[in-house]
Amino acid sequence: MLGRVDLRVALIAASALIASVSVSQAQVELKTYMDDKGYLNVRALTCAQLANTFQEDADFLGAWYSGWWNGHLKRHSINPARAKQGIHEVIVYCKANPDTKVVDAVDDYVKKVQAGGQ
């Protein structure tokens, strides 16, 4: 019983640490990266910029990139579960590779999926 309590305390402490690390990093609004006309150059956006924005903005951009790639590949349907998983994987990749362009991260992910790596 004592071991279970210790494990529970350790898990709670680890969760709190992870949450504090995520929150401690400044989140930047997407409008910071927009030009004076309100446009965002999606080809120039870096993984650091994606990873440092608010989660809902990162998810929105992920959905946009997904649609962009599906259009590029001439696909006219979506698998929502796979798209959400892909968006999550790209965001995680971007957090680990901040200097990479988001379009390159998405391209790498698409190639991985096409090769059967998912």
Model-derived regions: residue spans:
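Short N-proximal segments of mature Sec-exported proteins
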Residues: Q27-D108
